[in-house]
């Protein structure tokens, strides 16, 4: 189970709604993923209700919507978008994204912390996308964020867990869920994040641009389940030297003694 604020989810796979070829393909992939929490950019939402072709089916699937502030370059812009999202979609949940750099889409730590503090005061359940900075993640936790979402690699890059060492520190120190967001490009990488101790992952590009997004969504679902189960079961410790799984010499000694007799 994944516990975020006052909500319990059975799936540890969060998904996005961007880059799919058609809305129908997106909905089919999201259903195959088993995801119960899906993020959507506010800039894609028709505030006049014209986007119900997407929103209504999502709600019918029992999927909780997590609007995000992608496109915001400052704390003020993100706060404005958050207020619009709450009014338009009737949710106080928010994925906070502030990335002024259009080439690498790296999150602005100063503006993110500033916006998070204000939005928490306004009653939002804030899940901030941030760099894999243990100090920043702890500060975001301290101002009241419901989870932290450190990046594995730049958004859409499919590079995997490039920030592995820092993610380990964040996971060790966090008292809120850690959701690895951005850069995960293969189901094996998602499983790796869960085995490492992450509470969940968010995947969009790797599913949306796959040759078969529905099959890829199912692959990620199985990988996340496997990674989480492996972590729960207890992974064996790594060793430099070999450790035999059965006695190496007992059988030979028994045979030698039998031959002498």
Curated annotation (Swiss-Prot):
Any Pfam family the entry gives: ThiG
Residues that coordinate or bind 1-deoxy-D-xylulose 5-phosphate: 156, 182-183, 204-205
Family recorded in the similarity comment: Belongs to the ThiG family.
Catalytic activity: [ThiS sulfur-carrier protein]-C-terminal-Gly-aminoethanethioate + 2-iminoacetate + 1-deoxy-D-xylulose 5-phosphate = [ThiS sulfur-carrier protein]-C-terminal Gly-Gly + 2-[(2R,5Z)-2-carboxy-4-methylthiazol-5(2H)-ylidene]ethyl phosphate + 2 H2O + H(+)
Segments traversing the membrane: none
Active site location: 95
Record's protein name: Thiazole synthase
PANTHER family: THIAZOLE SYNTHASE
One Gene Ontology MF term: thiazole synthase activity
């Amino acid at each position: 189970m994944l516990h975020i604020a006052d909500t319990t989810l059975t799936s540890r796979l969060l998904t996005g709604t961007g880059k799919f070829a058609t809305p129908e393909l997106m909905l089919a992939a999201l259903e195959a993923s088993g995801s119960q929490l899906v993020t959507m950019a506010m800039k894609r939402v028709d505030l006049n209700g014209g986007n119900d072709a997407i929103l209504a089916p999502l709600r019918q699937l029992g999927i909780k919507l997590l609007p995000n502030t992608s496109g915001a370059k400052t704390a003020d812009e993100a706060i404005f978008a958050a207020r619009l999202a709450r009014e338009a979609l009737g949710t106080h949940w928010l994925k906070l994204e502030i990335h002024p750099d259009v080439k690498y889409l790296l999150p602005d730590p100063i503006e993110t912390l500033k916006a998070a503090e204000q939005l928490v005061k306004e009653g939002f359940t804030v899940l901030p996308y941030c760099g894999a900075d243990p100090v920043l993640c702890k500060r975001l936790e301290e101002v009241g964020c419901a989870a932290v979402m450190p990046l594995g690699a730049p958004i859409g890059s499919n590079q995997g867990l490039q920030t592995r060492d820092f993610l380990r520190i964040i996971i060790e120190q966090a008292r809120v869920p850690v959701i690895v967001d951005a850069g995960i490009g293969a189901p094996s990488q998602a499983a790796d994040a869960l085995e490492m101790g992450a509470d969940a992952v968010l995947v969009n590009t790797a599913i949306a641009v796959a040759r078969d997004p529905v099959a890829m969504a199912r692959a990620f679902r199985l990988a996340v389940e496997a990674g989480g189960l492996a972590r729960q079961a207890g992974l064996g410790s790594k060793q430099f030297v070999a450790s035999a799984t059965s006695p190496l010499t007992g059988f030979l000694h028994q045979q030698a003694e039998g031959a002498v007799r």
